[in-house]
Swiss-Prot record:
Key words of the record: Ribonucleoprotein, Ribosomal protein, RNA-binding, rRNA-binding
GO BP term (any one): translation
Family: Belongs to the bacterial ribosomal protein bL9 family.
Name of the encoding gene: rplI
Entry protein name: Large ribosomal subunit protein bL9
Zinc-finger recorded as keyword: no
The organism's taxonomic lineage, starting at the top: Bacteria, Bacillati, Bacillota, Clostridia, Thermoanaerobacterales
Gene Ontology molecular functions: rRNA binding; structural constituent of ribosome
Purpose: Binds to the 23S rRNA.
């Protein structure tokens, strides 16, 4: 009996895979537990269509990430912050502040979770930031924290 796996099954296969199993194993265990369904020709075609749509979506997202990376490459983002004596900030500048500055000043909307800082920025100066936009697409840019003069 051929079944289409609806979830990953240890020792059998991954979600979406068509596998051949014993009749009893399929009918008495996999199908009732919602782990698989019978592989009909219509279902196999539908899975192929879904896989193709998923691949197109991933490629589209990768192309968007490459476009954003090109915009970020070599960019210096200036962020004003209140600082005390010696250039120490009152508070810190984090991913959230950098993402907000990118959206406001450069019209680049990037999820703050995709921005990596070695540590929170707690002083004035220039700091490198790594943006992991998509698997295989990452770019480093600079953040310059300046005193806002108040």
């Amino acid at each position: 009996m051929k079944v289409v796996l609806l979830k990953d099954v240890a020792g059998l296969g991954i979600r979406g895979q068509v596998v051949k199993v014993a009749e009893g194993y399929g009918r008495n265990y996999l199908i009732p537990k919602g782990l698989a369904e019978e592989a009909t020709p219509g279902r196999i075609k539908e899975l192929a269509r879904l896989d193709q749509a998923r691949e197109e979506r991933v490629e589209r997202l990768a192309a968007q990430a490459r476009k954003v990376a090109a915009g970020l490459k070599g960019l210096t983002v200036r962020i004003p912050a209140r600082a005390g004596e010696g250039g120490k900030l009152f508070g810190s500048v984090g991913n959230k502040d950098i993402a907000a500055a990118l959206a406001a000043r450069h019209n680049l909307k990037i999820d703050r979770k995709k921005l990596e800082l070695k540590e929170p920025i707690r002083s004035l100066g220039k700091f490198p930031v790594l943006a992991r936009l998509h698997p295989g697409v990452q770019v480093e840019f600079e953040v310059e924290v300046v005193d806002n003069g108040t």
